[in-house]
Amino acid sequence: MENRMNELVSLLNQYAKEYYTQDNPTVSDSQYDQLYRELVELEKQHPENILPNSPTHRVGGLVLEGFEKYQHEYPLYSLQDAFSKEELIAFDKRVKAEFPTAAYMAELKIDGLSVSLTYVNGVLQVGATRGDGNIGENITENLKRVHDIPLHLDQSLDITVRGECYLPKESFEAINIEKRANGEQEFANPRNAAAGTLRQLNTGIVAKRKLATFLYQEASPTQKETQDDVLKELESYGFSVNHHRLISSSMEKIWDFIQTIEKDRVSLPYDIDGIVIKVNSIAMQEELGFTVKAPRWAIAYKFPAEEKEAEILSVDWTVGRTGVVTPTANLTPVQLAGTTVSRATLHNVDYIAEKDIRIGDTVVVYKAGDIIPAVLNVVMSKRNQQEVMLIPKLCPSCGSELVHFEGEVALRCINPLCPNQIKERLAHFASRDAMNITGFGPSLVEKLFDAHLIADVADIYRLSIENLLTLDGIKEKSATKIYHAIQSSKENSAEKLLFGLGIRHVGSKASRLLLEEFGNLRQLSQASQESIASIDGLGGVIAKSLHTFFEKEEVDKLLEELTSYNVNFNYLGKRVSTDAQLSGLTVVLTGKLEKMTRNEAKEKLQNLGAKVTGSVSKKTDLIVAGSDAGSKLTKAQDLGITIQDEDWLLNL
């Protein structure tokens, strides 16, 4: 029986791959179903012999309580965007200045959700969303229901891979046909449908919706020399990879590829929103490194957005948390990039003046980056004596006089007690990338502020369940959940708190770099501008902004209050002393280790202050070589790099 179960699992997984990944089934649906039912019966009779990669694991049936947070071992960076050929040429010049012979890999930018898959001994252990790049959500059970994600690799590997989970156009249409028939609201586009599906608590629905993936990266250190090699290796492991790609050192040829794909994209069975261009050499990628936000060795070209004409009916002016007043046009509704658009940003007063935008104008509307609706220009041929738009002189929230600083494009309200600014700051503090207080969204902030229960972020930690129960629509269960979420946020690592304070120019990545360096929010608040500016990836603008913020008396009082409520000020990630034994050294692991795993060796090196990379280059300081080290050892010897063995590492 065990042999038959093994045979059925192997056959069914192969047939599923042919159907879902290769679009080339070799058996009929009825034949597949017959074999599947046979396996189900055998597994009922012999549960002790169920294999971890059995296709029956994909059927669903679980109802999850929620999704736990997941700390990514390897951060998921954003990509720098490009919207023109000129920006790609500038990227090429930056790369070629360091590596004149660099070649690029151009790949399709799939319009889906980024996911990370971690395998231990070849078995899928964790599937997670991107989140903020450092912390995502554990959606393993849902990703197990995606038919082209292997549950078990043929090799006993420890590996973390990255890819895009998407909904094919055919599956999207089928879902919306069913929703229409049931009188339910349809999904606006395949990306929204994929996102909604991956956040389902009922895994049976996930299994039914036929999501798919394309893998594009090994996040864990790779022995491969090029991105092309990585993609071939991923495919050999059983992952789906996209075959629409091009390798070339010529940006002109890359541009021709982009033009061809853009022309043909509508015929693809899935949505794409651009082309990702990466330096093909892994060694060159390592040397080019990263900025605070993105790799220096990659860029994402975004296709020009779809454009539609609409009439401006009116304009709303709103105040953000930094006091910037933003105009938003109310439009006659139009369908744009799969969604109904009735509002679009006008950016700022200088933009309105430059484009001569007036109420009643017919304007061209597009989605910037396929996300944010914006007004591109006025269709002057359709203008009929519209009056020049009145620019507000007073803040729409507090009535204070607005200012237009020299050199800035935005109007600002500089009243620190402006109600809208306070509410926006409070909502930002509680947001996912900041203190991540579940249930503490803008609508709750509005209710609490209007009830005079909160006026600054410290007030959040004064709230009781009884306070929350005084608000309309808040019952005991939700009040208790919100209260516990507030208490739980006190234990966040301090970079979340720093970002939540909303300091100008200090984003989430900069917050993490700052706390990695200083370890404690108090120490950061007392640091000199020079010491902050010297941190790689930051600089003078951020240093000055922090210095200006922390020297305010009210900020010092706020920090004292947060301390009194036991809000954590310490960085909880790994910090390495600058006088650690290998501090500042770049180290490469190669060959087979006998007494420790590669991950154990990597962790030990990092704890000793080393930066562990996957490729040998002139920037490598040290190589730790096991048996069968191969070409990396040879290259290290040619470059005169110090070479140590496993015993040396064990004795450190």
Swiss-Prot record:
Reaction(s) catalysed (UniProt annotation): NAD(+) + (deoxyribonucleotide)n-3'-hydroxyl + 5'-phospho-(deoxyribonucleotide)m = (deoxyribonucleotide)n+m + AMP + beta-nicotinamide D-nucleotide
Active site, renumbered: K109 (n6-amp-lysine intermediate)
Enzyme class: ligase
GO MF: DNA binding; DNA ligase (NAD+) activity; metal ion binding
Domain BRCT: 577-652
Gene that this polypeptide is encoded by: ligA
Keyword match Plastid: no
Cofactor(s) demanded: Mg(2+); Mn(2+)
Family stated for the protein in its record: Belongs to the NAD-dependent DNA ligase family. LigA subfamily.
Domain of life: Bacteria
Entry's EC annotation: 6.5.1.2
List of residues binding NAD(+): D29, S30, Q31, Y32, D33, S78, L79, E107, R130, E164, K278, K302
Keywords: DNA damage, DNA repair, DNA replication, Ligase, Magnesium, Manganese, Metal-binding, NAD, Zinc
GO BP term, pick one: DNA repair
Described purpose of this protein according to its UniProt entry: DNA ligase that catalyzes the formation of phosphodiester linkages between 5'-phosphoryl and 3'-hydroxyl groups in double-stranded DNA using NAD as a coenzyme and as the energy source for the reaction. It is essential for DNA replication and repair of damaged DNA.
GO cellular component: cytosol
Organism: Streptococcus agalactiae serotype V (strain ATCC BAA-611 / 2603 V/R)
Protein name: DNA ligase
Binding of Zn(2+), residues: C395, C398, C413, C418
Disulfide bonds, paired cysteine numbers: none
HAMAP family: DNA_ligase_A
